């Protein structure tokens, strides 16, 4: 039986010979692909885009609608033609592409960011 790490939520600790490759490892790889080296296209788009490409990521703002409703401050990642959501940890960094800013996640939400 695996355990879950408290930082990225990755599964680990399978006993020797136990197969964790299927659902456990797939979830790990998808999470790593979504949050490592994080950049998002936008953070103030309240309606999910109509034709997102797989790999597109957004920070969900307050007052988001549709499938993003109730996901404020989460990372919405388009994977296999569906949205997956990841809750950032305090200190997570994200490059906001349309603003050319680097933002940090704090207890109050995402910072305004620094132009880079």
Each model region followed by its residue ranges:
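Extracellular "spike/adhesin" assembly and maturation modules
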Residues: 1-64, 80, 89-106, 112-116
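Short basic/aromatic-enriched segments
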Residues: 63-77, 84
């Amino acid at each position: 039986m695996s355990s879950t790490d408290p930082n990225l939520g990755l599964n680990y600790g399978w006993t020797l010979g136990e197969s964790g490759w299927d659902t456990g490892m797939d979830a790990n790889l998808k999470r790593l692909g979504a949050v490592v080296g994080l950049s998002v296209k936008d953070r103030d788009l309240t309606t999910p885009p109509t034709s997102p490409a797989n790999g597109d990521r957004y920070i969900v703002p307050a007052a988001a609608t549709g499938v993003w409703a109730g996901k404020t401050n989460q990372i919405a990642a388009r994977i296999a033609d569906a949205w997956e959501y990841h809750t950032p940890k305090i200190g997570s960094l994200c490059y906001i592409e349309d603003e050319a800013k680097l933002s940090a996640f704090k207890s109050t939400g995402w910072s305004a960011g620094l132009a880079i």
